[in-house]
Amino acid sequence: MKIIFAGTPEFAATALAALLKTSHEIIAVYTQPDRKAGRGQKLTPSPVKQLALEHNIPVYQPLHFKASTEEGLAAQQELAALGADVMVVAAYGLILPQAVLDTPKYGCLNIHGSLLPRWRGAAPIQRAIATGDDETGITIMQMAAGLDTGDMMYKTYCPITSEDTSATLHDKLAAQGATAICAVLESEETLQKYLAEREVQDESLTVYAHKLVKSEARIDWSMNAVQVDRNIRAFNPWPVAFIQLDENNALRVWNSTISSQSKVNAQAGEIIAIDKQGVHVACGENTFICLTSVQWPGGKALNAQQIAQTQKLHVGQILP
């Protein structure tokens, strides 16, 4: 089949790499415009664009597809002229109007990083960890105009462990998403079968995965240790949980575990011990967490042993 692929970050590039190994023809790639990145703020192509260029696939980077503007209408017409059988969309980042969704012969299929209708929206991986879900997965759906509202065609399941961060879970789901889309597109007959058997989402089970904002990554010591630990793992690698030491300095917290230490009548935010495991801090409900990797402004992330050597934190200190 002739496939258009639309995606931007590494999650999408993993799926594109898998599709490139199939017998299908990737006739075009759509991705977000190049963005400034890194310390030099150089214009940098997305991971999907880099992969497409390596395979000499034509790359399109429209700003939008709004038919109310000349450039949007031109982008729609350009896509239609490609004559695709199907379009695969993964973390593309642009809204696709109904006219675009209807253009390919079999419409547009989306690789979504959750078990829909749970966690529709921008941050399904992070929200699943922060909420304490013990399972997530991939849903392949036929796209509709609403936000992740399309009919479901295929699901795979992935346990969430107590050690998973958004970084580790992202990589597991990216691999699952790649396998899932290849299974759905094994042949034109297979695709037709999954389309015929697709399932409407139960709106009563909908939960939204709202976009992350930096401010919510500030650690709230009044929460119990289990919730603090979930948040630390959910916000790794972005925006990274932090302790606001003073107006200008934030201590980033990359990793943690539930502490085996305890102290009677400890104040929330109080450091009760510093040892080879890490920095043990009192949380709400008389629970305790152990910070195992932290990073001071301008420095590198430190492990438990290195934290103790800095002597920048001390037992009895109350973290804000």
Swiss-Prot record:
GO terms assigned for molecular function: methionyl-tRNA formyltransferase activity
Ranges in a coiled coil: none
SUPFAM superfamilies in the cross-refs: FMT C-terminal domain-like (SSF50486), Formyltransferase (SSF53328)
GO cellular component, as recorded: cytosol
InterPro entries: Fmt (IPR005794), Formyl_trans_C (IPR005793), Formyl_trans_C_sf (IPR037022), Formyl_transf_N (IPR002376), Formyl_transf_N_sf (IPR036477), Formyl_transferase-like_C_sf (IPR011034), Met-tRNA-FMT_C (IPR044135), Met-tRNA-FMT_N (IPR041711)
The keyword Mitochondrion belongs to this UniProt entry's keyword annotation: no
Catalytic activity: L-methionyl-tRNA(fMet) + (6R)-10-formyltetrahydrofolate = N-formyl-L-methionyl-tRNA(fMet) + (6S)-5,6,7,8-tetrahydrofolate + H(+)
Pfam families recorded: Formyl_trans_C (PF02911), Formyl_trans_N (PF00551)
Record keywords: Protein biosynthesis, Transferase
EC number: 2.1.2.9
Residues at which (6S)-5,6,7,8-tetrahydrofolate binds: S114, L115, L116, P117
Family: Belongs to the Fmt family.
HAMAP family: Formyl_trans
Purpose: Attaches a formyl group to the free amino group of methionyl-tRNA(fMet). The formyl group appears to play a dual role in the initiator identity of N-formylmethionyl-tRNA by promoting its recognition by IF2 and preventing the misappropriation of this tRNA by the elongation apparatus.
Protein name: Methionyl-tRNA formyltransferase
Species: Acinetobacter baumannii (strain ATCC 17978 / DSM 105126 / CIP 53.77 / LMG 1025 / NCDC KC755 / 5377)
Name of the coding gene: fmt
